């Protein structure tokens, strides 16, 4: 595993080691899962993975912002944002409880 960051390759390698699929098959599974999640999010669906967390989409309305250098008001356009909410069990695991 890479120091500090878990990558797609790390996940595929772990699947390869634990399940015994080939590296190519493991990488294809990882890509398929991530593609499916991305497609669902792009279609406006939230993605919930039990025991892990939920990727939540939220629509933000237009609002007025301010240029910090000039102080001039500028409109911030409406947009959709994605956040991740970790499950209770994931929060406890990360906290070491």
Swiss-Prot record:
GO CC, alphabetical: cytosol
PROSITE patterns for this protein: HISTONE_LIKE
CDD domains, per the entry: IHF_A
InterPro entries associated with the record: Hist_DNA-bd, Histone-like_DNA-bd_CS, IHF-like_DNA-bd_dom_sf, IHF_alpha
Record SMART domains: BHL
Keyword list, A-Z: DNA recombination, DNA-binding, Transcription, Transcription regulation, Translation regulation
GO molecular function terms noted in the UniProt entry: DNA binding; structural constituent of chromatin
One Pfam family in the UniProt entry: Bac_DNA_binding
NCBIfam families on file: himA, PRK00285.1
Recorded family membership: Belongs to the bacterial histone-like protein family.
Annotated HAMAP family: IHF_alpha
Protein name from the UniProt record: Integration host factor subunit alpha
């Amino acid at each position: 595993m890479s120091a500090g960051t878990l990558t797609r390759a790390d996940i595929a390698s772990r699947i390869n080691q634990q399940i015994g699929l080939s590296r190519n098959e493991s990488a294809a599974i990882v890509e398929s899962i991530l593609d499916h999640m991305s497609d669902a999010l792009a279609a406006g669906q939230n993605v919930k993975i039990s025991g892990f967390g939920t990727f939540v989409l939220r629509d933000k309305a237009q609002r007025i912002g301010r240029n910090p250098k000039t102080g001039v008001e500028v409109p911030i356009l409406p947009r959709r944002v994605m956040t991740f909410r970790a499950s209770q069990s994931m929060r406890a695991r990360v906290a070491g409880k």
